[in-house]
Amino acid sequence: MTMLSKGSRGYQVKVAQSLLILNGCSCGSYGADGVFGSATLSAVRKYQRAKGLAADGIVGPNTWNALLGL
């Protein structure tokens, strides 16, 4: 999977946002809109902290694996 960070856009962002929402991390009032903005950044950091990952706000290999249950 592609690394995602603030400013990323597209289908993979929408997938990551959907998985974050399913795991109880709100991505803001627009939900899974495919735009990695401030609300998604906060959701990623919250999720990473909850999973004991480095809370860098980047959806990289470790965060993808956790989101996908791998």
Where are these regions (language model features)?
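Acidic, Ser/Thr/Pro/Gly-enriched interdomain connector segments
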Residues: 1-34, 39
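N-terminal, helix-rich and Lys/Arg-enriched segments in bacterial and organellar proteins
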Residues: 16-20, 45, 64
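Extracellular LysM carbohydrate-binding repeats and other cell-envelope/extracellular binding modules
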Residues: 46, 51-70
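Extended, structured, electrostatic nucleic-acid-contact surfaces
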Residues: 21-30, 45-55
